[in-house]
Amino acid sequence: MKDNVLRNKKDFSNLFKNKSTYYSSFFIIYAYKNNLGWLRYAIAANKKNFKTAVERNKIKRQIRSIVRGLENKNIPVDILIIPKNNFFKTDFLNKKNDLFNLIVKIRLNIK
């Protein structure tokens, strides 16, 4: 699971240089095909939209939980997940379906 997290500056610069952007009602995702054969991700919840650390940590926990279901799907993509302002205005199941639909769209377009 630790191998699935983007951490290096080189990985982030590669992602921002060659990104494809995908939008949904709750997320913005930057995606870039990697050569590793599995999904790697990072989560960016900023202070401007989510004021308290409790909110930001809850967002990260929920997104990590959703991504855990995707780890064994062998999707060779690096993604940066950015939640939108309305993230807390719906239940977990809607967020999960929204993110899964975005990942399917990415999988179809990235190849």
From Swiss-Prot:
<comment type="similarity">
    <text>Belongs to the RnpA family.</text>
</comment>
<dbReference type="GO" id="GO:0030677">
    <property type="term" value="C:ribonuclease P complex"/>
</dbReference>
<dbReference type="InterPro" id="IPR000100">
    <property type="entry name" value="RNase_P"/>
</dbReference>
<keyword id="KW-0694">RNA-binding</keyword>
<keyword id="KW-0819">tRNA processing</keyword>
<dbReference type="Pfam" id="PF00825">
    <property type="entry name" value="Ribonuclease_P"/>
</dbReference>
<dbReference type="InterPro" id="IPR020539">
    <property type="entry name" value="RNase_P_CS"/>
</dbReference>
<dbReference type="GO" id="GO:0004526">
    <property type="term" value="F:ribonuclease P activity"/>
</dbReference>
<keyword id="KW-0378">Hydrolase</keyword>
<comment type="function">
    <text>RNaseP catalyzes the removal of the 5'-leader sequence from pre-tRNA to produce the mature 5'-terminus. It can also cleave other RNA substrates such as 4.5S RNA. The protein component plays an auxiliary but essential role in vivo by binding to the 5'-leader sequence and broadening the substrate specificity of the ribozyme.</text>
</comment>
<dbReference type="InterPro" id="IPR020568">
    <property type="entry name" value="Ribosomal_Su5_D2-typ_SF"/>
</dbReference>
<dbReference type="GO" id="GO:0000049">
    <property type="term" value="F:tRNA binding"/>
</dbReference>
<comment type="subunit">
    <text>Consists of a catalytic RNA component (M1 or rnpB) and a protein subunit.</text>
</comment>
<keyword id="KW-0540">Nuclease</keyword>
<dbReference type="GO" id="GO:0001682">
    <property type="term" value="P:tRNA 5'-leader removal"/>
</dbReference>
<dbReference type="GO" id="GO:0042781">
    <property type="term" value="F:3'-tRNA processing endoribonuclease activity"/>
</dbReference>
<protein>
    <recommendedName>
        <fullName>Ribonuclease P protein component</fullName>
        <ecNumber>3.1.26.5</ecNumber>
    </recommendedName>
</protein>
<dbReference type="InterPro" id="IPR014721">
    <property type="entry name" value="Ribsml_uS5_D2-typ_fold_subgr"/>
</dbReference>
<keyword id="KW-0255">Endonuclease</keyword>
